């Protein structure tokens, strides 16, 4: 199944380009990079300079670039949980 605007909530986010749109720590707003790890509550982002930043999903609004170059803005609370658990929710 391909990443699309409609099903991104049920996909693993590792490997997608990301930009932080809103976050309580204003120094992280505008940060761009690649999602290199995902846990139930956090995303680990590697910036172009190689810096790694772990952010809480629930605290932010993120813009993801899908493989087809489409950009999708998502509130972090919408992607809480592990990818496999998010998938189980849609299957039920």
From Swiss-Prot:
Q: List the catalysed reactions.
A: Endonucleolytic cleavage of RNA, removing 5'-extranucleotides from tRNA precursor
Q: Where in the cell is it found?
A: Cytoplasm
- Write out the entry's keywords from A to Z: Cytoplasm, Endonuclease, Hydrolase, Nuclease, tRNA processing
Instruction: Name the GO cellular-component terms.
Output: cytoplasm; ribonuclease P complex
Please state the Enzyme Commission number of this protein: 3.1.26.5
Recorded hits in InterPro entries, A to Z, give: RNase_P/MRP_Rpp29_sf, RNP1, Rof/RNase_P-like, Rpp29/RNP1
Q: Name one GO molecular function term.
A: RNA binding
Q: Which Pfam families match?
A: RNase_P-MRP_p29
Q: What's a GO biological-process term for it?
A: tRNA 5'-leader removal
Gene3D superfamilies, alphabetically? Ribonuclease P/MRP, subunit p29
Q: Is tRNA processing among the key words of this record?
A: yes
- Which coarse location class describes where this protein primarily resides? cytoplasm
Cited SMART domains: POP4 (SM00538)
Q: Which domain of life is it from?
A: Archaea
Q: How does it assemble?
A: Consists of a catalytic RNA component and at least 4-5 protein subunits.
Function (record text)? Part of ribonuclease P, a protein complex that generates mature tRNA molecules by cleaving their 5'-ends.
Instruction: Please state which protein family the record places this protein in.
Output: Belongs to the eukaryotic/archaeal RNase P protein component 1 family.
This chain belongs to the protein called Ribonuclease P protein component 1
Q: Which organism is it from?
A: Staphylothermus marinus (strain ATCC 43588 / DSM 3639 / JCM 9404 / F1)
Give the encoding gene's name. rnp1
């Amino acid at each position: 199944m391909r990443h699309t605007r409609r099903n991104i909530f049920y996909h693993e986010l590792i490997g997608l380009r990301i930009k932080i749109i809103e976050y309580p720590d204003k120094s992280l707003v505008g940060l761009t990079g690649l999602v290199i790890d995902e846990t139930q509550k956090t995303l680990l982002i590697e910036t172009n300079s190689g810096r790694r930043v772990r952010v809480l999903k629930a605290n932010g609004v993120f813009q993801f670039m899908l493989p087809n170059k489409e950009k999708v803005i998502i509130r972090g609370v919408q992607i809480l949980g592990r990818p496999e658990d998010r998938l189980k929710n849609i299957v039920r």
